[in-house]
């Protein structure tokens, strides 16, 4: 899929009131090419992919500060490495700062550089403040919009994720490159804050302009998931598959949503076929964090449903084990832990828990390490207790923090794996103190998401163990 608008040179960026401090037209165009692929979730072969564009960009102008900001920012926003452990990434941040100090930059560019440096330190809220400062004066700065959107997602700041786009949406007129994608970005924030009708309208508008917009497809997939519209969801994914399957950075995740509908229906073999055909190959090909959490979450959900996943955890473990000490995102950590527990690797499990505990004891300004003690570690311990067959302990750990788990980020659909963990623990508990917890949780789930086959199965299970009396 080639870029639909011509790539912008120095003058075009000036005309857009987003001037870039470089005299290289080639660098400006490669910056645009990189940004376009990031927004579209697609490595465009005709442009050389994101990696190809970034290496050519650095060659075109090694001192281009915004080139460094987008390059380093994309690695950081991928959450697959940390400056503490990845010396190359640490050097990239330092180089970006040095380059920015050697030349006069616009205030907007200075804020971009500062935001990336702040994000690298793990202070996501402060980084978002800096990106928001940019958007106040430059509402059509797509890089600030996308970086802040992703960071809000990692923070579980759902209202901010929505409102950040609401504030700038009117400025994105159809003549601006990538404007239709802003509809999709806005629709996701609306969906996560339960404005389903408005979200669907915007996502469908985006798709009418560009049917290959995989992120807007993704919003619609979420809406069907949250409303338990399983038949509609399956039909939508099947009919649109040819349009989004080439968006290589998001296709795996869209297949994950497809598989969730099948798990919801109890069609486990069909779900495993999607896993084996699309999700695992994507994980093994690129090891992106989104593919990692999709793989772990799906296998864990199937296991809770009583499905044998065979040796599949052994395929995931080599990827997750490399990240046991990263502690970039607590949300990621919980999923890495699912893999080491599922693969019965106590050494990796212990390494993750010990190093996370260490990080929580000297968090500095790192928002994830600050949250580890009260939310991240209890959640991780609950996963361990579930594996060890201690359902009452799982409840003791999770019930006090269940309304704080949103702070770990991810979407409502992704975090539902933790809701299911809590319900399964409640169904298996033995303590009289907890005998009515399953009933309460299931009534709540049924009220929020009526007509869910998965909830109906859990209610039947509760009835057989006399927990609904």
From Swiss-Prot:
The keyword Iron-sulfur does not apply. The keyword Acetylation applies. Transmembrane segments: none annotated. CDD domains: StaR_like. The modification Phosphoserine is found at residue 5. TPR repeats lie at residues 108-141, 180-213, 252-285. The modification N-acetylalanine is found at residue 2. Keywords: Acetylation, Phosphoprotein, Repeat, TPR repeat. Belongs to the TTC38 family. This is Tetratricopeptide repeat protein 38. The gene is TTC38.
């Amino acid at each position: 899929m080639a870029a639909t608008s011509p790539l912008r040179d120095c003058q075009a960026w000036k005309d857009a009131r987003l001037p870039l401090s470089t005299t290289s037209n080639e660098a400006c165009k490669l910056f645009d090419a990189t940004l376009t692929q990031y927004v579209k979730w697609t490595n465009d072969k005709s442009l050389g992919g994101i990696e190809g564009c970034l290496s050519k960009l650095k060659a075109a102008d090694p001192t281009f500060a915004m080139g460094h900001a987008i390059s380093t920012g994309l690695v950081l926003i991928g959450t697959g490495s940390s400056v503490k452990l990845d010396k190359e990434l640490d050097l990239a941040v330092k180089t970006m700062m040095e380059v920015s100090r050697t030349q006069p930059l616009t205030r907007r560019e200075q804020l971009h550089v500062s935001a990336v440096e702040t994000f690298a330190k793990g202070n996501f809220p402060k980084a978002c403040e800096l990106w928001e400062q940019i958007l106040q004066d430059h509402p059509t700065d797509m890089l600030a919009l996308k970086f802040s959107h992703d960071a809000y997602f990692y923070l579980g700041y759902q209202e901010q994720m929505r409102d950040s786009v609401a504030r700038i949406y009117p400025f994105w007129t159809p003549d601006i490159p990538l404007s239709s994608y802003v509809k999709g970005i806005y629709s996701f924030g609306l969906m996560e804050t339960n404005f389903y009708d408005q979200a669907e309208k915007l996502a469908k508008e985006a798709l009418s302009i560009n049917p290959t917009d995989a992120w807007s497809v993704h919003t619609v997939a979420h809406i069907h998931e949250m409303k338990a519209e399983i038949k509609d969801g399956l039909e939508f994914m099947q009919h649109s598959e040819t349009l989004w399957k080439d968006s290589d950075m998001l296709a795996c995740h869209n297949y994950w949503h497809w598989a969730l509908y099948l798990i919801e229906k109890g069609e486990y073999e069909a779900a495993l076929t999607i896993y084996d055909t699309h999700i695992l190959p994507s994980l093994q090909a690129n090891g992106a964090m989104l593919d990692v959490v999709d793989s772990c979450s799906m296998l864990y959900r199937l296991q809770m449903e009583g499905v044998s996943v065979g040796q599949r955890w052994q395929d995931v473990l080599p990827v997750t084990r490399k990240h046991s000490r990263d502690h970039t995102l607590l949300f990621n950590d919980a999923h890495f832990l699912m893999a080491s527990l599922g693969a019965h690797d106590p050494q990796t499990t212990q390494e993750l828990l010990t190093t996370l505990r260490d990080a929580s004891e000297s968090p500095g300004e790192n928002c994830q390490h600050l949250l580890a003690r009260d939310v991240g570690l209890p959640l991780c311990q609950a996963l361990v207790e579930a594996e060890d067959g201690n359902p009452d302990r799982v409840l003791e750990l999770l019930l006090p923090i269940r309304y704080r788990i949103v702070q770990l980020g991810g979407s409502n659909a992704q975090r539902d794996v933790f809701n299911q963990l809590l319900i399964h623990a409640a169904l298996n508990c033995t303590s009289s103190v907890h005998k009515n917890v399953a009933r309460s949780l299931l009534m709540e789930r049924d009220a929020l998401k009526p007509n869910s086959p998965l909830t109906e199965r859990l209610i039947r299970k509760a009835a057989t163990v006399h927990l609904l009396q």
